[in-house]
Amino acid sequence: MGVALWLCPKRNTPTYDKLITVMSSLNTLFPGSPPKFEPHITITTNISLDLADQSKTKDDVDRILSASAVAMNSLPKNHESLVKLGNVNSQRKFFKKLYFEVEKDPNLVSFARIIRELFVIVPQDIEKENIKQNPQLYTKDNNGNTIRRKPSKKKSKTTEVKEFDTSFIRQAAAYKAAEWSVQEFDPHISLVYSDLWPLHSALWRNINTRISDIDWDIEWEFGVLKLVLCEGDVNDWVVLGSVDIH
């Protein structure tokens, strides 16, 4: 998943408190010790971010969060709530073992499309084209992946870099993002991460009882946007930065 953008409810709000309560309760129904995580909707994964240079990482995080906040705040105020909870569902996938479906509100879909276009598709496609146009800037790592060469400390001739027009790439990215938002964007709020499968009927009865014990007539304010490095164990995921949405 790499770096993901999460939309989270604000702490100490009814939405946050109720989700945390039910997530903690449901965790006890599953074997082992399912990892704990914040309630969130994943807007998109695989956001392009330079993690090698910490100073550049901070600048990129601030830039992406600032632009995301502007995009969120520019959405039409023509709905009661951007996030509307649906049914509880389950899949074989570890990260979608148990989750609330979330209605694909047009504004939520529009926001996800914008973020996907600007911070996933455009930078990835520009990088792919740059590899074609300027192969001298890249090398292979031990796993055979193409990576940028590190600047040489030795004095040498300046490497000539070929410039290229990115307008077509950006136009194509808009279409790719629109297609992704319709076919792949699947907003949901995970409640439990687990390898358990299938979920037997007795477990489902307990799940439904614990969920129905809580009044879900709640409004999700715009909340908080967070950039999260989702690599390795869930307990090791790192919040790189966040911004409140008012």
UniProtKB/Swiss-Prot annotation:
Disulphide bonds in the chain: none
Keyword field contains Repressor: no
MF-aspect GO terms: 2',3'-cyclic-nucleotide 3'-phosphodiesterase activity
Cellular component aspect of the GO annotation: Golgi apparatus
Pfam families with a match to the protein in the record: CPDase
Matching Gene3D superfamilies: Cyclic phosphodiesterase (3.90.1140.10)
Chain positions recorded as substrate binding sites: 42, 190, 193
Highest taxon listed in the record's lineage: Eukaryota
Subcellular location, record wording: Golgi apparatus
Stretches with biased composition (Basic residues): 147-156
Family per record: Belongs to the 2H phosphoesterase superfamily. CPD1 family.
Protein name: 2',3'-cyclic-nucleotide 3'-phosphodiesterase
Protein source organism: Candida albicans (strain SC5314 / ATCC MYA-2876)
